[in-house]
UniProtKB/Swiss-Prot annotation:
It comes from Mus musculus. This is MAGUK p55 subfamily member 3. The gene is Mpp3. Residues 6-60, 61-118 form the L27 domain. The modification Phosphoserine is found at residue 307. PANTHER family: MEMBRANE-ASSOCIATED GUANYLATE KINASE MAGUK.
Amino acid sequence: MPVLSEDSGLHETLALLTSQLRPDSNHREEMGFLRDVFSEKSLSYLMKIHEKLRYYERQSPTPVLHSAMALAEDVMEELQAASVHSDERELLQLLSTPHLRAVLMVHDTVAQKNFDPVLPPLPDNIDEDFEEESVKIVRLVKNKEPLGATIRRDEHSGAVVVARIMRGGAADRSGLVHVGDELREVNGIAVLHKRPDEISQILAQSQGSITLKIIPATQEEDRFKDSKVFMRALFHYDPREDRAIPCQEAGLPFQRRQVLEVVSQDDPTWWQAKRVGDTNLRAGLIPSKQFQERRLSYRRTTGTLPSPQNFKKPPYDQPCDKETCDCDGYFKGHYVAGLRRSFRLGCRERLGGSQEAKVPTGAESQVLLTYEEVARYQHQPGERPRLVVLIGSLGAHLHELKQRVVAEDPQQFAVAVPHTTRPRKSHERDGVEYHFVSKQAFEADVHHNKFLEHGEYKENLYGTSLEAIQAVMAKNKVCLVDVEPEALRHLRTPEFKPYVIFVKPAIQERRKTPPVSPDSEDIASSLDEQQQEMAASAAFIDQHYGHLIDTVLVRQDLQEPAASSELS
């Protein structure tokens, strides 16, 4: 085996060791790793630098002069005063060059060992267990968007700390700012003795890039977990009117029935969410489900939130003598045009006199409307179509709407055939216009909860059964069904996956024109009353059942026909 001399450098030693490595059956991978490491060019360069430094230490050169720059300046003064020979001019020009002057200045700095700034001495009473705070300089680039972080003053230490990181904001995208970090400076401005609102103003006025001096939190919280939960809002929310929100500017306003993507539930009181379909990728604060339920429960207990039974009864729910219907009419051999109105009239005949408003009662009335978890619906091949449920206020004329939809595309849409105890007429066919059944069979089906809803009109029973709806869906057609709003809870099942459409007529203010005759004045007055009843009916349904509605359809074309039919 070759023997190395004492003067052999580390580079030669490693090179010789590499050549002497022999593969071992037990350590073949380790030997290959060492051979690869020792063969790297970067390691070879480092070894050469190491040898040069060791050589410098052994030589230990000492500077001949500690002020070469001062000597050069003295020589330059002598040359300027001396005779002007070519050699003297050349030396003067050489000593005046910036590069040589810089070399001499570096020489003096090294000779004088002027390497580091002189730090003040440590105080005598320093705590031995004191740990130096690590300061982090963070530079963020943002346009006109907010920083995406909220701050607060710590009650115990008085420091300004990061309270919340908003998902999708500049701070979140950087990954350099965390909850609990202490903020010391913003763009060189100390913020320790400033109020949080003053600091927010400084941050808002900073455009382009912003530099933060931060002391990291002692225990950094984990990064946000990927949380994608979709919630449908069942109430309107405006953060500007919420005095409990930590930061109104960070709040996310939304309307009832909007779908929200909840991206963070770390805070049990305030969630972070985005509106689905919104181009703004930054999340905002919304009250959590638990917090909103507590708040609504408190308001209901203290009387600031009226319970559903306390709402004023709408005018449309009063008995109306002018409303008439011929339930014998039918829609092209498939559905009775006036069936929905016959149910209403039948209920009025049975109850008699004035009615109470059909508000939710029992456990349903005590439900606190906050959020409803939803999932994006994607129709799968071979899956039955969703059930389309129509509910309407006065003047909606749902039967005409269904007639128009089915007539335009009878291969895709259909309606459920209702049941009745009325005797069959000569032109009617069982299972087409109606399912004609006996009163005993009808009442038995009612007892077994086979009907979605049912009613009595002129001593005859009418009803829409769940089996009739299922029969339409089994044909791979979209079933259109109109029901009273209180029947919606029976249809909200995984089997039907109902899509609920609230249909209401357009209500427009009547132009104030002088009446031509007393008769025209009476007609105009009747129209105004009907418009008010329609508006009250729509408001009542939206107030009590709006959380069950998916979309609202305003019918512009049926306003005048509805008014004329009511007057006839």
